[in-house]
């Protein structure tokens, strides 16, 4: 049995010009980067509308919109 801590790598992703360090398995790096890009795109759409201010509110609205797309 392998140790999960040793099976991960740290990946840097950028969302709204902010860098985040995220650990994931090597075979999940591509999906993580695509997910971060998708979240960044959705948050930018909300931010550019000007209707919602504050990074936390933009993030919550993006999360709700993304969840709605999959429900």
What would you call each of these model-derived segments?
Residues 1-27, 34:
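A positional/architectural concept
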